[in-house]
């Protein structure tokens, strides 16, 4: 049995082909796994657990089907869906995790998993904005507003963020490898898996010939899905990108 990791699916009513591909992924690929870890930004927008719509209902049913097959599902918040709460998590049968976790495999190997936005430490303005949005009081005030007002506020914030991002350098938008490396050292781990940047890659950092850190970055789902599979028996790690319309053949 294997453990699957995905991130940045960005489900939206505006992208039904991604939704269809994700549902096929859950039905065919995830059903054969031991566990599924969703590392944030499952949804393009999340305004609160009271925002019921057909997309949210269908995704909850599909994830609940994993739970009913005794396949564990875990979720780490992303920067698009950090308001996803316990009510929706229960409907999905998934467990909410804190912003970064250390997994210990049966072999003893440790893997750090996180969404990845906290690694973009060179972007000071984003980190300040993130800290503000994640404050419990700010979140409670926002969630107390009518859904229509929340939607307008979110649209305005997103528009500003899109414009602001256009003028940021690649250095600011990418992760800080030193911070990632320090996190691995502090947790006595040698593998990190994250998303957020939409730049799939495998970074190898050599501390010595025998001591190599691997930082694996998941891609954003669009025409292709992105997945990391960890085989607990032999510690094999497989990074895969696959056409969403061919999941049944995968």
Curated annotation (Swiss-Prot):
Binding site for Mn(2+) 1: 8, 10, 41, 198
Predominant location category: membrane
Lipid bilayer topology: Peripheral membrane protein
Protein location: Cell inner membrane
UniProt catalytic activity: UDP-2-N,3-O-bis[(3R)-3-hydroxytetradecanoyl]-alpha-D-glucosamine + H2O = 2-N,3-O-bis[(3R)-3-hydroxytetradecanoyl]-alpha-D-glucosaminyl 1-phosphate + UMP + 2 H(+)
GO BP, sorted A to Z: lipid A biosynthetic process
Gene Ontology, cellular component aspect: cytoplasm; extrinsic component of plasma membrane
Class of this enzyme: hydrolase
Reported cofactor(s): Mn(2+)
Positions contributing to Mn(2+) 2 binding: 41, 79, 115, 196
Pfam family, one: Metallophos
Function noted in UniProt: Hydrolyzes the pyrophosphate bond of UDP-2,3-diacylglucosamine to yield 2,3-diacylglucosamine 1-phosphate (lipid X) and UMP by catalyzing the attack of water at the alpha-P atom. Involved in the biosynthesis of lipid A, a phosphorylated glycolipid that anchors the lipopolysaccharide to the outer membrane of the cell.
Entry's family note: Belongs to the LpxH family.
Protein name (record): UDP-2,3-diacylglucosamine hydrolase
